[in-house]
Amino acid sequence: MTGSTIPGVAYGSVERHADERGSFRELWRRSRLPEPFVQANLSTSAEGVLRGLHLHRRQVDYWVVAGGHAFVALVDVRRLLDGSEPRPVVETRGLGPDDSVTIPVGVAHGFLAIEPLELLYLVTNEFDGSDELGFAWDDPAVGVPWPSVTVTADGRPILSDRDRSNPPLAELVARLRG
């Protein structure tokens, strides 16, 4: 695992053992990543799909790229939420097959599928709609430098209705601070 500018974020890669029969990958081992994961998910995304920016207050995520390439954006809003910093910390990175990232509570995350993508992710909580928060992927106050996509006429990503309607980060922060 390698470090990050964001505390608690760790990048790594899983080892692939391949021969003429195929390959084997160990995706997770408790001794290396002792988070109490309780649910595993597999997401598939077509080229040009953007998922995010999503935020959890009670869940750690561990992602492994099973196939394809993603542009990943992480936005640390913890110090913004507690009032100790005026801006979030933004970090981006490309992830390819077998790359992994651990995302702690309070770090928003999203990805753009640069090509067809399979993403395996383990989480520390079962799905809980009350912990499925999000803010606008293109919020200029956050400034994620998303690459343009070539699969749409306007160069913008393909979004879910939820991600298309997420509020600006300032609105989410105001709501969470209550």
Task: State the predicted function of each range.
Residues 94-115:
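Conserved metal-binding segment of the jelly-roll/cupin
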